């Protein structure tokens, strides 16, 4: 199994990827480091594929990973509902490749390569 350690323990890495995946689903675009974005890409693609399946088992698998955060305060929609109701149907005809990574230059302070990862 190939993955990046990202300088964290496995629990910290899983928590960080859960947070980033939830934020990406809610905001549809986030700014992060290049290595985090590349690792996040595979996680989010799997979540969107679960959303496209749309059955109860897929919903429960996604719920086990996605954080329970409010995506839209007006409607009370949470991140999981947004994934299954808004994001996944958008990619019904697309077989993978749901995200785009665009480089934006180094971060001030430590010169880490920064990118914007967004849903296509």
Curated annotation (Swiss-Prot):
A single MF term (Gene Ontology): structural constituent of ribosome
Classify the source by domain of life: Bacteria
Keywords, ordered alphabetically: Ribonucleoprotein, Ribosomal protein
Q: Name one Pfam family in it.
A: Ribosomal_L17
Give a yes or no for keyword Lipid biosynthesis in this entry: no
Q: Name one GO biological process term.
A: translation
First and last residue of the signal peptide: none
Q: Which GO terms describe its cellular component?
A: cytosolic large ribosomal subunit
- Say yes or no: keyword Ribonucleoprotein present: yes
**Gene3D superfamilies registered for this protein in UniProt:** Ribosomal protein L17 (3.90.1030.10)
UniProt cross-references to PROSITE patterns, sorted A to Z:
RIBOSOMAL_L17 (PS01167)
**Annotated PANTHER family:** LARGE RIBOSOMAL SUBUNIT PROTEIN BL17M, RIBOSOMAL PROTEIN L17
* Family per similarity comment: Belongs to the bacterial ribosomal protein bL17 family.
NCBIfam families found in the cross-reference section: L17 (TIGR00059)
How does this chain assemble? Part of the 50S ribosomal subunit. Contacts protein L32.
- Tell me the protein's name: Large ribosomal subunit protein bL17
Q: Which organism is it from?
A: Bacillus cereus (strain ATCC 14579 / DSM 31 / CCUG 7414 / JCM 2152 / NBRC 15305 / NCIMB 9373 / NCTC 2599 / NRRL B-3711)
């Amino acid at each position: 199994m190939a993955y990046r350690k990202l300088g964290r323990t496995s629990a910290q890495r899983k928590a960080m990827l859960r947070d980033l995946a939830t934020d990406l689903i809610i905001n549809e675009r986030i700014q992060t480091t290049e290595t985090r974005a590349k690792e996040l890409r595979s996680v989010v693609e799997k979540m969107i594929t679960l959303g496209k399946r749309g059955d109860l088992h897929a919903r429960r698998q996604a719920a086990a990973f996605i954080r329970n955060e409010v995506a839209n305060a007006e409607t009370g929609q949470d991140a999981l509902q947004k994934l299954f109701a808004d994001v996944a149907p958008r990619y019904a005809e697309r077989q993978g490749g749901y995200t785009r990574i665009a480089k934006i230059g180094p971060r001030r302070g430590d010169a880490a390569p920064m990118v914007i990862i967004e849903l296509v």
